[in-house]
């Protein structure tokens, strides 16, 4: 097998996905980073929005091992929010906005989230649900108003928590699976031979798109 397979001298060295992303921002600031049917952001635009979110969260005390809940439709800012949480040093747990109230409540209470990020529209639609939760609801529109759009100086270690994903709960209560930064960094391995593609299509549930 070793004779058949192409050998590579590539050696994996850990870098958190936040730094890998910032490197792409430096290399390709004006290239499209994310696009939907309604809008698109370049790497520079996505990074700026993520930084405003990150700096807002840091000011509120988000840091290492703090899980932040996310309830958003699939949109370009969904990726800005995830990146912003990671840039703040936190981790994220996502619940799709069409999930039943009981499931959303279980996920966020089980994960112990201090904050949930959502939009004004979703907050209005799910007002009854959010009123039952003990965490603070943060509106995306307000987080994006933070004047500090610079990259946060956050140190992320290999085994810091990156995100928490929940099973369907079809055989009982949903179970949270903790994913560390080393796992995600290895998945998006920066070996150029593994990155020769323009991008990918994300069509699954927002709560499963990192699985």
Residue map of PLM features:
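Short, intrinsically disordered, charge-balanced linker/junction segments flanking boundaries
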Residues: 204-211
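Residue-level recognition of the N-termini of beta-strands and the immediately preceding loop/turn
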Residues: 66, 202-203
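Low-complexity basic/metal-binding stretches
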Residues: 190-194, 198-200
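Carrier-protein-dependent adenylate-forming modules in NRPS/ANL systems
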Residues: 1-185, 195-197
């Amino acid at each position: 097998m070793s004779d058949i397979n192409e050998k590579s001298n590539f050696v994996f060295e850990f870098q958190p996905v936040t730094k890998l992303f910032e490197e792409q921002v430096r290399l390709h600031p004006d290239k499209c980073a994310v696009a939907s049917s309604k809008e698109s952001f370049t790497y520079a635009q996505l990074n700026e929005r993520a930084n405003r979110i990150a700096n807002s969260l840091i000011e509120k005390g988000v840091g290492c091992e703090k899980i932040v809940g996310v309830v958003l439709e699939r949109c370009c800012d969904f990726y800005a929010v995830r990146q912003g949480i990671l840039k703040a040093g936190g981790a994220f747990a996502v619940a799709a906005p069409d999930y039943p109230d009981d499931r959303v409540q279980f996920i966020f209470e089980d994960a112990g989230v201090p904050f949930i990020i959502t939009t004004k529209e979703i907050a209005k639609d799910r007002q009854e649900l959010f009123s039952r939760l003990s965490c603070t609801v943060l509106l995306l529109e307000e987080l994006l108003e933070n004047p500090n759009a610079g990259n946060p100086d956050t140190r992320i270690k290999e085994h810091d928590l990156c995100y928490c994903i929940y099973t369907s709960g079809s055989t009982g209560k949903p179970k949270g699976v903790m994913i560390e930064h080393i796992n995600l960094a290895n998945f998006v391995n920066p070996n150029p031979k593994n990155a020769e593609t323009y991008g990918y299509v994300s069509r699954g549930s927002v709560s499963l798109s990192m699985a």
